[in-house]
Design a protein with these regions (language model features):
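Conserved alpha/beta-hydrolase catalytic His-Asp/Glu region
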Residues: 115-117, 131-183
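Flexible "cap/lid" loop of the alpha/beta hydrolase fold
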Residues: 91-96, 100-131
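Conserved HGGG/HGGXW glycine-rich cap/lid loop of the alpha/beta-hydrolase fold
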Residues: 2-52
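Acidic catalytic loop of the alpha/beta-hydrolase fold
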Residues: 196-200
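Short beta-strand/loop motif that positions the catalytic acidic residue
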Residues: 185, 191-193
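Gly/Ala-rich beta-loop-alpha elbow adjacent to hydrolase catalytic centers
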Residues: 82-86, 90
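Catalytic histidine-centered segment of alpha/beta-hydrolase-like enzymes
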Residues: 223-236
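Active-site loop/oxyanion-hole signature of alpha/beta-hydrolase fold enzymes
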Residues: 29, 39-81, 237
Length: 243
């Protein structure tokens, strides 16, 4: 798994986990605003970006690989923040390896499985070739609130995502339920959701918050499914507060 690390080696470590269909570059606006407040660890998840050569297989396998990254780069633990698919992985890491997670920021994690995942995945498989078309990638980028300066990154990486990675990652995403260990996580946890996200996502945030006593929840006004890209200023400020 490709991992980018930068920032002050003596600063508190932060592991940032991107969403599906994008890559570590989605955190660039946040990093620009975070400055030297953190030592940032940014992987490209399997099947994405610079890790496109590795097929995404499952959340469990990816969480184990991320735990190995933390064992090597932040053995005393790190603040873990994830968006969408990356937010699901954040809850999984917190549940299974709380010794490596000093705090969790869970942004827009779906925590209620879809009723008919097979139908969704069938349609997705049929539409997969469209991801390699620039016009379609541009439409998707708009839905994901990708800013103009990151559009080329999105178009490039969309074409790199294999059908196997697409189906595996989305399949895991739409079947996801909160791991049992999440309710026992003892370190600080913040759940975030956009005020304009779908009802499913807002309810998922309530579930995630409700399942963990002592967690906090923020609904961000004016935001859809794209808080780190829509409000990188706010997101960087929140990360700095969690350190």
């Amino acid at each position: 798994m490709y991992v980018l690390e930068n920032g002050d080696p003596q600063a508190p470590p932060v592991l940032l986990l991107h969403g599906g269909g994008v890559a570590g570059w989605m955190w660039r606006p946040t990093l620009d605003r975070l400055g030297g407040a953190a030592r940032v660890i940014v992987p490209d998840l399997p099947g994405h970006g610079n890790s496109a050569g590795e097929t995404y297989r499952s959340h469990a396998e990816t969480a184990r690989a991320l735990a190995e990254v933390l064992e090597e780069r932040a053995p005393r633990g790190a603040l873990v923040a994830g968006f969408s698919l990356g937010a699901q992985l954040t809850t999984l890491l917190a549940a299974t390896r709380p010794d490596l997670v000093t705090g969790a920021v869970v942004v827009s994690a779906q925590a209620r499985p879809l009723r008919f995942p097979g139908t969704t995945l069938g349609l997705l498989s049929a539409a997969a070739p469209l991801a390699r078309q620039r016009w379609f990638a541009r439409l998707q980028a708009k839905e994901l609130f990708v800013p103009a300066e990151l559009l080329d990154d999105y178009i490039r990486d969309s074409a790199l995502v294999s059908r196997a990675t697409l189906l595996a990652s989305v399949g895991e995403n739409i079947r996801f339920t909160l791991p049992a260990g999440w309710s026992r996580f003892e370190n600080p946890a913040l759940v975030m959701v956009g005020e304009r996200e779908r009802t499913l996502m807002r309810n998922s945030a309530l579930d995630t918050h409700g399942a963990l006593p002592g967690s906090r929840m923020i609904s961000v006004p004016g935001c859809g499914h794209g808080i780190p890209l829509q409000r990188p200023d706010l997101f960087a400020e929140i990360l700095a507060e969690q350190l």
